[in-house]
Structures are given as structure tokens and as C-alpha cells.
Amino acid sequence: MKGEPKVIERLNDALFLELGAVNQYWLHYRLLNDWGYTRLAKKEREESIEEMHHADKLINRIIFFEGFPNLQTVSPLRIGQNVKEVLEADLKGEYDARASYKESREICDKLGDYVSKQLFDELLADEEGHIDFLETQLDLLAKIGEERYGQLNAAPADEAE
């Protein structure tokens, strides 16, 4: 089915963000795991995989519209050098995605593409869940300090990889 070019463009814009998020969350997973934040690392891994599923849905929709998914470029990664920076970097990415998806859903609505609008609504709901988690973690980190936060997010030595 031939798709509306503006919708295909917005789907590719979202793919750009999701592919960057896959890589950023995966690298943060590996860094956090290495730093001993194994529980938070596990969450970052789960987020990376979820973002990969988002990318797959976008690719599928672009192909359905006889468009070409652009996997050549990804959004720039924001990589934290400590646990606080990791959380802040991820939060910035989620804020960017939320703003983009809000705009995209409106464009799809105006063009009468309710299925793509629904996809953006689904992505938006997931990103808002990520935002809530990250904001909560940053608030917790500020309240209890990095040392205690680290204790909460480290697995016992016999559970580490």
C-alpha cells in the first residue's frame, strides 16, 4: 500500500530515535554492569530490547507503506560517565522521543492515518513509562546519595555475572 510521504518521513524520524536508544541503553547496560550496578544494568538491558521492538514495528510500518526504512543513521548517543549521568542521558533521550512522537501522532491524525497514529500513541505511552522510571531513579539518587543508591542496585556477589 502506498503511504503518505509525510507519514513515512515521521516513521523514519522515529526509527532514527529508536535505533539510537537501542545502542545507548545497551552500552549503558554494559557500563552499569561493569560498575557493579547489576540491577539497574538489567533494567537498561530490558529497555534496549524494548526499543528494538519499537524499531521493528516502525520498520514494518514503513515497509507496509512501500517506503524504505533508514537504518543507516541513528540518533547521537549520550553516554554517561557515572550512574547519575547515565540516568540523565537516558532521560534526555526519552524527552526527545516524547516530543517527536507527540508531533508525529498529530500529523498522522490530520492526514487520517489512524493506524500510524495508534502506533505513535503506543510508543508515546512506553516512552512516558520510561520517563517516569528515570525521573523516579534520579529523585531517589538525590535523596539517598550515590553510595546508598549503589547498594540498592548492586546484586550480591554470588548473583553477579
Curated annotation (Swiss-Prot):
Q: Return the CDD domains for the record.
A: Bacterioferritin
Question: Which Gene3D superfamilies did the record assign?
Answer: 1.20.1260.10
**Which InterPro entries does this one have?**
Bacterioferritin, Ferritin-like, Ferritin-like_diiron, Ferritin-like_SF, Ferritin_DPS_dom
State whether keyword Transport applies. Answer: yes
Residues given in the record as Fe cation 2 binding sites: 51, 94, 127, 130
Instruction: Name the positions where heme b binds.
Output: 52
Q: Which cofactor does the UniProt annotation name?
A: heme b
Which enzyme class, named as a word?
Answer: oxidoreductase
GO annotations of cellular component type: cytosol
Q: Which reaction does it catalyse?
A: 4 Fe(2+) + O2 + 4 H(+) = 4 Fe(3+) + 2 H2O; Fe(2+)(in) = Fe(2+)(out)
Using the record's annotation, list all stretches that form the Ferritin-like diiron domain. Answer: 1-145
**Record: residues binding Fe cation 1:** 18, 51, 54, 127
* PANTHER family, per database record: BACTERIOFERRITIN
Tell me how this protein assembles.
Homooligomer of 24 subunits, arranged as 12 dimers, that are packed together to form an approximately spherical molecule with a central cavity, in which large amounts of iron can be deposited.
Report the family membership: Belongs to the bacterioferritin family.
| Known role | Iron-storage protein, whose ferroxidase center binds Fe(2+), oxidizes it using dioxygen to Fe(3+), and participates in the subsequent Fe(3+) oxide mineral core formation within the central cavity of the BFR protein shell.
Q: What is this protein called?
A: Bacterioferritin
